[in-house]
Amino acid sequence: EDKLISRYDILVNRYKELVSEKLSRKDFIEYNEILFSAHSCAIEGNSFSVDETRTLKEKGLGMIPKGKTLLEAFEILDHFQAYEYLLKNLDRPLTEELLKETHRLLTEHTLSYKTQYDEIPSNPGEYTTVDMCAGDTIFGDHEQLIKQVPRLLQSTQQVLDSGKIHPMIIAARFHGFYEYLHPFRDGNGRLGRLMSNFILLKKEQPLLIIPGSQREEYITALKYIKKERTDEFLIDFFFRTSIKRMEQEIEEKKNLTENFIRGMEFVRNVKSSNDDISEI
């Protein structure tokens, strides 16, 4: 794990130097917002691609791609506003008020539809009033689990303030605990990933974006917490996912730069050859 942490820390410095600090803050925030929203919602079954998510960000509901539902569009738009809310509140500690407001924004236009057949109505920003299940997992007594939420938030904030544990480890451990509390009627996965990134951003770390293509690996890492009584697999997954993304973006930027330079050299050579021919 120490080698992985060291590799991550070295790469973060390179990533900031070569990628994030070279872009304007506004552009980098929007770039991350689109990627994160598209992939986080894709994990939950949303079919919007990154390009379609970008179009939705730029044009809103006036340009919903063919074959996409209004529910999917609202899910993405709500994710945008929840993410932007957290960005504006990075100086605030982890509290129930922050968590509930983020959930309210995240599910504002989708919760009533998704829970329309519930006997008891669910409201955005309010805890579940029934026990929860997801996939093949049945969670514990909802009242007992909800009582643990303030404790989780408080202990996570204390560890953050101490500065003794790596931010990625804190983000992963919080995520693992939170997902098994599952305190809201819907949106727990998206909210958990938002709050993990809130933790990382508070410590000036790059955003963790779990690609939709890695959904099964991600779910397996979460299940290991219950199966093996350890969050080591999730911590490892968080580190490796972030490392892979940073390496890919650094390499992509390098290749695009080199290709552009080679292209310009080709143009100059062609122009030089044409000039030579015209002189004959």
Regions found by a protein language model. Name each.
Residues 1-280:
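FIC/Doc superfamily catalytic core
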